[in-house]
C-alpha cells in the first residue's frame, strides 16, 4: 500500500466499477505504447482500445531528478501519487465536476511526465508564482487540478494564473472525495502533438501551456 491510501482504494474501486457495469476492465487507447497494465496477450500495435488494470510498481518512481534539476524540494505526495502504480488516466465524478486524474502508463511515460513537470514548474517560476504540480484536469474549460507544493493542499488552477479555488487540505482527502466514472475510452486525433506524448490529458495540458506562451 502506498502512503496515499485513498489512491489505493480508488484504483481498486475503479476496476470494480467497470467490471460491475460493463463486465470488463476499463479500456484505453495506448497509441502503441507497451505497458505492464495491459490485460491479456494482445498486440500493442493495435489501433483498438486495450483493457488494462493498475499494477503496483516494484520500485517506487521518484522525482529526485526533478528536484535536482530545479533545486527545489517537492512535497512527498508527488512520489506516492505518480510513483506507486502504473495505470491509465482515471476518469472521475465529483462535486466540482467531472475530470481525469493523470497516472503513468509505463516507465517511459513516467520519465516523460517528469519532463512535463519540469516545464510546468519552470513556467510557475517565470510567472513569479508559488510552485505547484499537476495531478489532472477537469472537463470544464481549462481547469487543471494542482497541488500546492508548500502544504500539499489541492486546488483548481488555470494556466498562467495562481491557484484559485481550494478543493481539499490534502491530496489524500481530495482523492477520497472523487468517485470512479464509467465511460467509453476516447480516442483523440493529435495533429500537432507528437505521437509519443501521453494520449489525451497531455494534449489538453500542452494546449493550455502553448496558449499561455503565445500571449
Swiss-Prot record:
Keyword tags: Cell inner membrane, Cell membrane, Membrane
Gene Ontology CC: one annotated term: cytoplasmic side of plasma membrane
Record's signal peptide: none
Cell location: Cell inner membrane
Domain of life the protein comes from: Bacteria
Membrane topology according to the record: Peripheral membrane protein
InterPro entries per UniProt: Syd, Syd_sf
Role: Interacts with the SecY protein in vivo. May bind preferentially to an uncomplexed state of SecY, thus functioning either as a chelating agent for excess SecY in the cell or as a regulatory factor that negatively controls the translocase function.
Family membership noted in the UniProt record: Belongs to the Syd family.
Protein name: Protein Syd
Gene this protein is translated from: syd
Amino acid at each position: 500500500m502506498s502512503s496515499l491510501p485513498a489512491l489505493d482504494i480508488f484504483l481498486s474501486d475503479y476496476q470494480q466499477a467497470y467490471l460491475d457495469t460493463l463486465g470488463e476492465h476499463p479500456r484505453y487507447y495506448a497509441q502503441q505504447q507497451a505497458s505492464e497494465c495491459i490485460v491479456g496477450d494482445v498486440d500493442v500495435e493495435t489501433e483498438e482500445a486495450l483493457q488494462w488494470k493498475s499494477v503496483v510498481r516494484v520500485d517506487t518512481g521518484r522525482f529526485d531528478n526533478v528536484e535536482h534539476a530545479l533545486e527545489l524540494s517537492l512535497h512527498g505526495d508527488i512520489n506516492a501519487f505518480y510513483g506507486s502504480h502504473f495505470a491509465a488516466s482515471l476518469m472521475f465524478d465529483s462535486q466540482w465536476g467531472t475530470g481525469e486524474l493523470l497516472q503513468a502508463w509505463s516507465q517511459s511515460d513516467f520519465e516523460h511526465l517528469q519532463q512535463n513537470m519540469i516545464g510546468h514548474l519552470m513556467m510557475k517560476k517565470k510567472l513569479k508564482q508559488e510552485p505547484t504540480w499537476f495531478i489532472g484536469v477537469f472537463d470544464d474549460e481549462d481547469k487543471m487540478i494542482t497541488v500546492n507544493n508548500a502544504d500539499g493542499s489541492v486546488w483548481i488552477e488555470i494556466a498562467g494564473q495562481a491557484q484559485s479555488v481550494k478543493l481539499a487540505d490534502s491530496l489524500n482527502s481530495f482523492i477520497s472525495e472523487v468517485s470512479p466514472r464509467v465511460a467509453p475510452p476516447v480516442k483523440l486525433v493529435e495533429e500537432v502533438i507528437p505521437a509519443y506524448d501521453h494520449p489525451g490529458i497531455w494534449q489538453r495540458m500542452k494546449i493550455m501551456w502553448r496558449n499561455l506562451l503565445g500571449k
